[in-house]
């Protein structure tokens, strides 16, 4: 998950507590909740990203590092992937995986998504998977992503969304409000934590609204791809090569 400085101290502590407490079961629960479809959605998203060889990538809100490791394979030994997250327990698991994998092109850091510890124009690509909805100020996070991207750089975001077809919408609401918290209780003994995650998915904007937020943050060529009947959406956007200008040419 991602820390947001606009949270109250109580919320900050609560959110950190939630993700630290579910970290040991996080990978297992992702597979159970998505019926193992989360790997397929990520694979489809990465296929659309194209050739990443040699690129520098920031995997924001990296959690236990699943996407980070996939990205490291794609960039190869000449590329670099940094996984950043606020939860120390999530990062401990990610670092344990890294020790087993012995990847030399991955680095894991603890950090704040609202104030990224990187210079302007540091990365070719920024990814964020299922982390944006856990911050109350989505636009601020997107603006930070925009800042650390190089001109022409790309952002790719996978997040929960809201189906529009009635049958999918009803199934989505039933599943997220009732089934997902129940699965969290049964398999991870974490009913309250997964009720909180359900609420974050419920409150998160739909794919079209999120597209508009990307544009508001300064991105161009914003597109999205839906998965799971619209319950999940992958957004793709680009930081323009040309800086914006306030100068207007023409008659006054």
UniProtKB/Swiss-Prot annotation:
GO MF, any single term: demethylmenaquinone methyltransferase activity
Key word Magnesium present: no
InterPro entries recorded: SAM-dependent_MTases_sf, UbiE/COQ5_MeTrFase, UbiE/COQ5_MeTrFase_CS
EC number(s) given by UniProt: 2.1.1.163
Pathway the protein takes part in: Quinol/quinone metabolism; menaquinone biosynthesis; menaquinol from 1,4-dihydroxy-2-naphthoate: step 2/2
Annotated binding of S-adenosyl-L-methionine, by residue: 64, 85, 112-113
Catalyzed chemical reaction(s): a 2-demethylmenaquinol + S-adenosyl-L-methionine = a menaquinol + S-adenosyl-L-homocysteine + H(+)
Domain of life: Bacteria
UniProt-listed GO biological process terms: menaquinone biosynthetic process; methylation
Keyword set, alphabetical order: Menaquinone biosynthesis, Methyltransferase, S-adenosyl-L-methionine, Transferase
Function text: Methyltransferase required for the conversion of demethylmenaquinol (DMKH2) to menaquinol (MKH2).
Family: Belongs to the class I-like SAM-binding methyltransferase superfamily. MenG/UbiE family.
Protein name per its UniProtKB record: Demethylmenaquinone methyltransferase
Record gene name: menG
